[in-house]
Amino acid sequence: MKEMDERKQEGELHLLGGSTVYKQDYAPEVLEAFTNKHQGNDYWVRFNCPEFTSLCPITGQPDFATIHIDYIPDVKMVESKSLKLYLFSFRNHGAFHEDCVNIIMKDLIKLMDPKYIEITGIFTPRGGISIYPYCNYGRPNTKFEQLAEKRLFDHNQ
């Protein structure tokens, strides 16, 4: 509890511990980051988000998915409540499945500048077809750029 109070006092976190306002459309501005206290270590962080929803931009029908977010942090890390509110903001947003995962990845790169990140969307079937889009990013000119290429080429093998 002391650590959270320190982070709130340092101005890093604003949403955690407060009342919740749910945005009605895509809202990247709700994302918050905090300082990684283990910057000397390379390690994975995984978020499993089983209740993601968005709207088909053509039909307006809801799409449902589990979103997996895996990243190797550097200086900044995404705060989980802000991530939850951000993902919730897609609920009334029209975007194709492939767009959703790429938008999420780009917004998280902008927020955190991670060493490596990958996003997988496991969308439930509509019309008898499931779509599982995957995207990734590794920081250019580092071993993480090579990791991104390898994981992309080895994906689903």
Swiss-Prot record:
Binding of substrate, residues: 78-80, 97-98
Keywords assigned by UniProt, alphabetized: Cytoplasm, NADP, Oxidoreductase, Queuosine biosynthesis
Pfam families for the chain: QueF
Active site (record annotation): 56 (thioimide intermediate), 63 (proton donor)
Molecular function terms from GO: preQ1 synthase activity
Entry-linked Gene3D superfamilies: 3.30.1130.10
Entry's Gene Ontology BP terms: queuosine biosynthetic process; tRNA modification
UniProt record similarity statement: Belongs to the GTP cyclohydrolase I family. QueF type 1 subfamily.
Protein name, as recorded: NADPH-dependent 7-cyano-7-deazaguanine reductase
Organism expressing this protein natively: Parabacteroides distasonis (strain ATCC 8503 / DSM 20701 / CIP 104284 / JCM 5825 / NCTC 11152)
Taxonomic placement: Bacteria, Pseudomonadati, Bacteroidota, Bacteroidia, Bacteroidales
Gene: queF
